[in-house]
Structure formats: structure tokens, C-alpha cells
Regions:
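Aromatic- and Gly/Pro-enriched, solvent-exposed loop/edge beta-strand patches characteristic
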Residues: 385-475
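Predominantly the structural core of cysteine protease catalytic domains
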Residues: 34-40, 45, 76-88, 108-116, ...
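Sec-dependent signal peptide cleavage junction
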Residues: 22-34
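Bacterial N-terminal signal peptides that target proteins for export
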Residues: 2-12
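Alpha-helical support elements that line or immediately flank enzyme active sites
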Residues: 100-125
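Bacterial N-terminal signal peptides
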Residues: 13-23
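Beta-rich interaction/scaffold domains
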Residues: 521-590
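Short, surface-exposed beta-strand/loop patches at domain edges
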Residues: 445-520
Length: 590
């Protein structure tokens, strides 16, 4: 009996060894993979806003728990009773009131207003040539409303095939999530002078898809604004600048003689239909300032910049009660300015995801140039809005790697993340150096808290027709998920069948994990600029875009950054294309 037991024990051990070494996730037929639920990000359209489909349409003013009230009071202790970004020690950190006209681009005006404010609040450099005719920074809402909703088929772009289909594209509506995901993918912010709303009918050039005069480093999103959330928003306003937010706008904007006040309590967050910019607050703004037939219970209101033009009531500003029942989707956008060339490695060019709580996910990339991996980015879905604990690991893979962890671990970092939005984890101190041609992986795990086994939701692109028509592309060897202790190619996971014979993951695409690499070669490549400038100065009657782009390109100095050179060349290519002198994608790889 002992010999037989020893034989079977060796057989079982051998079988387990075989299973653990299966290449890139080939599971034996008898194995039951972990098949967690898929949560699609579903939205419904309320005028110019896309709001979560499961939000209640009717609600009373949210109840505040004792814990929330205590937390809010602790945070509020260090905050002033009033604050306005329009006047911080004599300086304004808000750009002028814009007019969205008849478009549904309120979400883009609010998001980019937050970006502009953050850049000003940080004191980032704003060259004179980047300012509009009124002398201020002015980003293109049209570009942000166009490219995420437009397919692009550029050979070599790993996000080709990732987009959303909507009638009239982003003019039909959007939200801060779409704005954040688009900016994270490198779609803007573009300058208004090179992608004017006036050009919407003829469209925008693919040459300009990735024109970005600054880079969005991260975003934070509060889906619901409770009492504790008010304190968070106030802190954001003081730390980072203006905050995008959404609310139901079909109530009465009451003119009390001194200001415009807005409050209603019949419609909840599910009815939110308009995005605006929070630029300040006043705890003592009297409840008596609101219309007598519908007044909040307490004093206090947000100072709001609208996007209905400076000729609108209040000069484009109004006060919104703290108790506004529909206030939601508060978002801030943190911007940065790169002085040296930066490469963004990504597969997720989409702006809409599905969420699955797999144990871990990984993306595998190939370094196009030598450089230092300085940042990893990933989204925290609204289902993870309470925050969580992340673990990021980076591997340099073997030539014959059989999984995304089959190689040398270059670093591992853990920590907490808060709120929804697109997160940015700095790996600057980890000194992760990559050589051209290196295959490397970025592995992401999300848990409820440190030491917890409770998994949080990981985000993946999705092909879905629910609410919106979403498109994504994926290839073998790009994204992997961990099921138990086995790494499996997402292309294979898409074929898994559950006990009902359905394929719950068939719509999934790549994992939303990005790697930011600061390139080692800092010499500026002027090849595209030279190619664009070779066509010479435009005629006096040439297209305005061509003229503006030529002026920008001609004004560059020898110490221009790679980003400045790339933006100028792309704008000039777009102008040449508009004139019929070239066709996309000519010169794109110059």
C-alpha cells in the first residue's frame, strides 16, 4: 500500500507541475476557471449629458450619516467660510465664460475649464503664442468631442479601432468620465485656434488626434456629492483649481437682485442633464437668496461658471445650493507639462469600459526606444469609488516568456488610491530602465484594502451596443488576466463558456493599463516639422487653419521641446491637408 500511495502522490505532483507550467493560460478541459461577473458602464442620455443608467431619477436631499458629518467637520476646520478662484490674492485662476451654443458639449467645456484652471493654479508655463485673441489659454472642446467618437485606422497605433458611435459624436453628449479617459489616451488638450467649433461640419484631421499642449496626469471623480464630499470639493478647489460637476438644469435660475441662485429638490442625480464648473463657495450664502417657493434648509452655495455665454443671466455665473439634490459627478483634472520626450504605451483608446474583478490583469508592451518607465496609469471605476489598495509590478520578459511574469521583476509598488477617475502612480524612484526592443509587462492588482483578499474591479475595453455603440480591438499577446494562479491571454478568455453555454467575456478587449516612459534620447526630432515647412508660406487667401499653423511652426525656437515641435508639425499637416496639398497619413512617420 505504501508503494501505491507513493506512486499516486508522484503522479498528482507531476500533473500539478504540468498544469502550473501551461503556456499563456491553456487550461485542461476539466479545470473550472474563475468566472467573475462583468459590469458594463451603462449610460443614459439626458440632453448633453450621459449619466449612469442605474442612477435614481427622483430623490430627496441626501441623508447625512453621523460618520460623514464628523469627517466633514474635521476637514472643514481648516477651510475658509468662502473662497473664489476668481480672486485669490488678486489673481484669477478661471478662464472666461464660454458659449456652447446649441451643442451638447457642456461636459467638454466643464472638463477643459478644469484643466485650464489647474494649469493656471500650478503656474505652468503658458507661452504667449498659445493664448487666444483675448490673451488667455483656450482649449478646444470640439477636438475632445470629436476624436473619442471617431474611428482611426493608423497602422502601428495600438488604439486603432477603439471608439464610441453616437449620432453627432460628442455634440450629442458626454460626461467627465469620457473626458478623463480621452485625455488619458492623449487626445488633447488641443488649442481652440487649431480646432475651432466653427469647423465641426467639415471635421478634424487625424494628423491632430494626439495634439496635446499639456498632458493629463490624473483625474479624480466623486460620483455622489454628500456632506463629506463637499469638504473634498472645497479642498480640490483650493489645491488644484476649478472642478467640473453635473446637475439638473431645468429648474428656475432665480434673480434675487444681487445674484442668480439655483435650487430644486424634485430631481435627483439620475436627471442631471448639464455640466458646469465649480469655482468657489460661500458657506454664508443665505438660503433667503433662493426663490421663496423652493428654498434650501440651510445657508451655503457653490459659485458656478456656466457655458451659456457671458450675456446669460449673471454674466455666466450663478450660485448653486449645497443642498441641490441633483449635484453629482464632481471631477478635477491634474495636468503636467513635459520638457523631454514621453512615450505613452497603451492599448485602450476607448472612453468606455466594462469592469471585472479578476485577481490581476497585465499588459505586455515592447519598448520602441530606450527610456525610464516613470508612471503607470489605470482607471478606478465608479464601482471602486471608495478607493482601494493597488499593487503594480513591472517585469522585463524573457524572449520565450510564457506569462507576463516570466522574466525579471524590475519593481513592485503598493499603495492606496482614492475616488474614481484615471489614476497615476509614479515609479520615478523605482528607476525602471528599459532598452529599445525590451518586452515588458505591467501587472495590476486591486484590493479593497491592504492585506485584504477582496478584489476590486479591473477595467477592460468593451464591444457593446448597450446604451451606446462601443468598439474596441485586441490582439493575442497584449492583455492577460490571472485566474487562480494561471495567466491567460484575454483573446482566449473571450472564448470561455459558462455553465449556460454563454460567453460572458466575448465583448471584452484590452486592460486599461498604461505605461509612461520618459525617453532616454532627448534630442528633438525635427523631421516632420521640416517636411511640413517645405511647402512654404501660405497664400494670403489660404485656409485660416493653414495660416495659423504656419505661424505657429515658423515661430518655434531652437530650444523648442519635442511636444511643441510635434504639435506644430501636426497642425501644419492638417492645414496642408485642408488645402488639398497632402493626404493623411503622408509624412506621419517622417
Amino acid at each position: 500500500m505504501r508503494k501505491k500511495w507513493a506512486y499516486w502522490r508522484r503522479a498528482v505532483i507531476s500533473l500539478l507541475c504540468v498544469i502550473s507550467c501551461l503556456p499563456w493560460g491553456q487550461l485542461p478541459a476539466a479545470a473550472e476557471p474563475d468566472m467573475p461577473e462583468v459590469l458594463e458602464e451603462t449610460w443614459k442620455q439626458n440632453d448633453g449629458l450621459l449619466v449612469p443608467a442605474n442612477e435614481p431619477a427622483q430623490t430627496d436631499t441626501p441623508e447625512v450619516t453621523d460618520d460623514e458629518a464628523e469627517e466633514s467637520l474635521r476637514g472643514a476646520g481648516s477651510l475658509p467660510s468662502s473662497y473664489s478662484l476668481l480672486d485669490v490674492d488678486g489673481s484669477s485662476y478661471v478662464t472666461s465664460v464660454k458659449d456652447q451654443g446649441s451643442t451638447g458639449l457642456c461636459w467638454a467645456y466643464a472638463a477643459l475649464g478644469s484643466c485650464e484652471s489647474n494649469i493656471m493654479k500650478q503656474g505652468l508655463d503658458i507661452p504667449e503664442s498659445w493664448k487666444d485673441s483675448s490673451g488667455e489659454l483656450n482649449f478646444s472642446e470640439a477636438a475632445l468631442g470629436w476624436y473619442p467618437f471617431t474611428n482611426h485606422l493608423l497602422v502601428g497605433d495600438l488604439t486603432s479601432g477603439d471608439y464610441i458611435t453616437m449620432d453627432n459624436k460628442g455634440i450629442s453628449g458626454g460626461n467627465p468620465t469620457i473626458a478623463g479617459y480621452g485625455l488619458a489616451a492623449g487626445i488633447g488638450p488641443q488649442l481652440e485656434q487649431f480646432a475651432s467649433m466653427d469647423d465641426w461640419s467639415q471635421g478634424y484631421s487625424e494628423y491632430q488626434r494626439y495634439n496635446a499642449y499639456y498632458r493629463m496626469q490624473s483625474s479624480d471623480l466623486l460620483q455622489q456629492v454628500d456632506t463629506a464630499g463637499r469638504t473634498v470639493i472645497k479642498q480640490w478647489l483650493m489645491e488644484s483649481g476649478a472642478v467640473s460637476a453635473s446637475f439638473y438644469s431645468k429648474g428656475i435660475f432665480f434673480d434675487n437682485g444681487d445674484s442668480i441662485a439655483y435650487y430644486q429638490k424634485r430631481h435627483g442625480t439620475g436627471d442631471a442633464d448639464h455640466a458646469v464648473l465649480l469655482v468657489g463657495w460661500d458657506d454664508n450664502y443665505s438660503r433667503e437668496n433662493f426663490q421663496k417657493s423652493c428654498q434650501p434648509k440651510s445657508d451655503g452655495a457653490w459659485l458656478v461658471r456656466n457655458s451659456w455665454g457671458a450675456d446669460d443671466v449673471g454674466g455666466g455665473y450663478f450660485w448653486l445650493s449645497y443642498e441641490e439634490a441633483s449635484l453629482c459627478e464632481a471631477a478635477r483634472f491634474q495636468m503636467t507639462q513635459d520638457s523631454t520626450p514621453v512615450a505613452r504605451y497603451q492599448y485602450d483608446g476607448s472612453v468606455s469600459y466594462a469592469n471585472v474583478n479578476f485577481s490581476a490583469a497585465a499588459n505586455v508592451f515592447t519598448a520602441e526606444k530606450s527610456g525610464k518607465l516613470t508612471e503607470v496609469m489605470f482607471p478606478m471605476t465608479s464601482n471602486n469609488s471608495q478607493g482601494g489598495w493597488y499593487t503594480i509590478s513591472v517585469y522585463r520578459l524573457k524572449n520565450n516568456a510564457q506569462s507576463p511574469v516570466d522574466g525579471t521583476k524590475l519593481c513592485s509598488k503598493q499603495g492606496t488610491v482614492q475616488y474614481g477617475g484615471y489614476k497615476n502612480i509614479s515609479l520615478e524612484a523605482q528607476n525602471v530602465m528599459l532598452q529599445k526592443g525590451d518586452r515588458f509587462s505591467v501587472v495590476l492588482e486591486l484590493r479593497k484594502e491592504k492585506g485584504s483578499r477582496e478584489k476590486l474591479w479591473l477595467s477592460f475595453e468593451s464591444n457593446s451596443t448597450e446604451t451606446l455603440e462601443r468598439h474596441c480591438s485586441i490582439q493575442s499577446g497584449q492583455t492577460f488576466i490571472c485566474s487562480g494562479d494561471t495567466w491567460i491571454d484575454m483573446v482566449d478568455v473571450k472564448q470561455w463558456q459558462n455553465s449556460s453555454g454563454k460567453k460572458p467575456y466575448s465583448n471584452l478587449g484590452n486592460a486599461a493599463i498604461k505605461a509612461i516612459v520618459r525617453e532616454q534620447d532627448t534630442a528633438v526630432n525635427w523631421a516632420q516639422w521640416n517636411a511640413a515647412m517645405s511647402y512654404g508660406e501660405p497664400a494670403a487667401d489660404a485656409d485660416p487653419l493653414y495660416q495659423a499653423a504656419y505661424a505657429e511652426a515658423a515661430a518655434l525656437s531652437e530650444d523648442a521641446t519635442q511636444a511643441e515641435v510635434d504639435n506644430a508639425a501636426a497642425n501644419l499637416f492638417a492645414g496642408l491637408e485642408r488645402e488639398g496639398l497632402i493626404q493623411y497619413s503622408q509624412y506621419i512617420y517622417a
